Amino acid sequence: MGKRCPCGTGLTYGECCYRFHSGEWVAPTAEALMRSRFTAFAVGNSQYLLDTWDPETRPSELGLDMGIDFYRLDILETTGGGPFDSTGTVKFQAFYKGLASGVQEEDSTFRKVNGAWVYSTGDVD
């Protein structure tokens, strides 16, 4: 918990995304949810990923490739997704290494369901 959070805020995991993962906090914006979901990939928390996935697009199960290490997130653009919005998009780059190394760029769409931000869909470049 004392290590720097993978989402890139500069805070420790315990001060940052762990609070979302533990249920102590709920993401106030689409970008905050994106950061917490990236960190969930980085720490292997598939349950959080499923819990924050839009019920209309959520898979029944999610298998994470533990051979991939997600180590850096760059937020490129955010549209909407604020506390008073109902939808938003976040364009980001996720850097990874492992059996293969590279960067995945994605435009993700988020919406609020019962007042909470959820991930709906993503277009991978």
From Swiss-Prot:
It comes from the Bacteria. InterPro entries: NTF2-like_dom_sf, SEC_C_motif, UPF0225, YchJ-like_M. Disulfide bonds: none annotated. Belongs to the UPF0225 family. HAMAP family: UPF0225. This is UPF0225 protein Cgl1438/cg1626.
